[in-house]
């Protein structure tokens, strides 16, 4: 017996279930393409929704910030790592998000797992959408308070729960949802949720990770102009960079600076990352044409896939779940598409529910209509070999 026997046992269990995850080296190529093992593939599974990750301005400003402020922030922002470039980015972000204040955090996962525990005490109640991201689920667990799930995108069920819990003695109630759901590509009913939060004196926190850059006024998300207490989002998707943010009131920002363990005990983001974020925030507001192209191509692909009998759920965004059911079918389809020149990764449990394995297609503004049609044809060829 070895003290590490449990490691091999777990890996073997995953191999037997075809759920062993492995890493593949990827190199960016031109446009929306990547190179894997010498093969050029059109990438249809990245979150680089506006194609900004290799934009010259992001690269240039990352270099400029690194030259001015160095390679690293050297410490937590509460010690000596709060370089002046943070203020520059946060002030710009708050203006764009139409909130009094904003705070840069290190990653989307860190944000959700530190904001939720900060907002709640042991006597709180979190009302969470049933299909929320794993980072929200873990944030709820770390909050160590009561958690109730409401049916996915169902304001009526949420209202029922709010009524039922009104006089249960909770110190506060917090509703948490994604605005654009990462695995299903559908959007929450923001007006309904905001109305319920106001009517029932509940806090509302919205994860805008997959909406930032793509939806809303100037691409700043579906919460813009809405009465949402805590808006979390990321820079590693539509903005093409890395990191996360929370947009909120000035008082909440001060509260998070003092209460968010993930912020307090982490070294600040490197200046180069802040530079690329700063550049993205200059570019994104003026990219309405790219946003329209992206969403038009997604709508076109949904129609094309439907003609082949594929189920894309309730998707209404740049994310299209092509749901095929079994894990083996998703793996087979992924390999088939790679043979046709597309990188399209299979998404399987536990990332999605059992029997809902899928190819998660996520389009970019760099994809042309011809790219989308070729992808649709490849799906059709798998359906009708």
Swiss-Prot record:
Subunit structure and binding partners: Homodimer.
Positions bound to pyridoxal 5'-phosphate: 108-109, 182, 207-210, 234-237
Record-linked InterPro entries: Aminotransferase_I/II_large (IPR004839), AON_synthase_class-II (IPR050087), AONS_Archaea/Proteobacteria (IPR004723), PyrdxlP-dep_Trfase (IPR015424), PyrdxlP-dep_Trfase_major (IPR015421), PyrdxlP-dep_Trfase_small (IPR015422)
Source taxon at top rank: Bacteria
Family, similarity comment: Belongs to the class-II pyridoxal-phosphate-dependent aminotransferase family. BioF subfamily.
Keywords, alphabetical: Biotin biosynthesis, Pyridoxal phosphate, Transferase
Binding-site list for substrate: 21, 133, 351
GO BP terms in the entry: biotin biosynthetic process
Pfam families: Aminotran_1_2 (PF00155)
Protein name: Putative 8-amino-7-oxononanoate synthase
Cofactor: pyridoxal 5'-phosphate
Enzyme class, broadest EC rank: transferase
GO molecular function: 8-amino-7-oxononanoate synthase activity; pyridoxal phosphate binding
Source organism: Desulfosudis oleivorans (strain DSM 6200 / JCM 39069 / Hxd3) (Desulfococcus oleovorans)
Pathway(s) where this gene product acts: Cofactor biosynthesis; biotin biosynthesis
